[in-house]
């Protein structure tokens, strides 16, 4: 570059920093902006699909899908992972439907979880903004966008028309929130429902409420679907779930992850590791038998899952082999602490 041009740019950058503060303008190579930190989702398959080992810090994430597909479960697992690493989490419960006992079973520290149940959409988003601006929050979850009802709609009559009010509210809120979220390095997760457009002949009629702003501002969009029911005899044990990364600004998009969501347990870690182990040929499958090196894990998937649950050393070993393959952080073997935690939880339940 021309020396005079370089001097002029440096002078301009100096003036901008004087006026707007240090860090308001910089060269991309000076700061490791591209080294994006991530919070694990608590599901190895999903961490791999996201490409960076979890949801990106300082970004907006949208989780959407049909009813009872596992959207809130995924969000609660991310909160649990953030808290495990010493993070502070907030949950804006616009649906007024958060179940504390279920959250605890998923590993959420509910004693230190900041919860708000706002009366209006404006109030909920203002609370979220205040928490993000405090720079003390690592993750904030809004459940859900569809339940963020504008004040005018709440105060109006039941049959009144309020066209575009929620979309305007979301657009204005995200314009204000986006910069604060990035500066505070906080993850903002918006859970969203599905709606169907009327009269669509071609293409998907499915859409998400709250306008288009959230689609634009989100760095990651996750489509959560229930694809099957897990049964043992006549007993229903859980759901088989598929997550598709429909938008990803931090890694290649359109990757899928499939895992089990077990009732009263959440995402099955053993099932996730077992499936990935078979996929990566770390775990051998012969007929209905699963084996790892010389160890027989069991006949049938559920029996193999139970064997890994009873032998956490083996589970860690298989998981870390998969993590090494994808350059993800290695999980420390903290079996004694985990066993004690499980005993404490069982004692509390009794």
Curated annotation (Swiss-Prot):
Localisation: Cytoplasm
GO process annotations (BP): DNA recombination; DNA repair; SOS response
Residues annotated as transmembrane: none
Record keywords, A-Z: ATP-binding, Cytoplasm, DNA damage, DNA recombination, DNA repair, DNA-binding, Nucleotide-binding, SOS response
Gene3D superfamilies in the cross-refs: P-loop containing nucleotide triphosphate hydrolases (3.40.50.300)
One GO molecular-function entry: ATP binding
Residues noted as binding ATP in the record, renumbered to the chain: 65-72
A GO cellular component annotation in the UniProt record: cytosol
Leader sequence segment: none
Pfam families: RecA, RecA_C
SUPFAM superfamilies the UniProt entry points to: P-loop containing nucleoside triphosphate hydrolases, RecA protein, C-terminal domain
NCBIfam families associated with the record: tigrfam_recA (TIGR02012)
Family: Belongs to the RecA family.
Functional description taken from the UniProt entry: Can catalyze the hydrolysis of ATP in the presence of single-stranded DNA, the ATP-dependent uptake of single-stranded DNA by duplex DNA, and the ATP-dependent hybridization of homologous single-stranded DNAs. It interacts with LexA causing its activation and leading to its autocatalytic cleavage.
Protein name: Protein RecA
Source organism per UniProt: Clostridium tetani (strain Massachusetts / E88)
Biological classification of the source: Bacteria, Bacillati, Bacillota, Clostridia, Eubacteriales
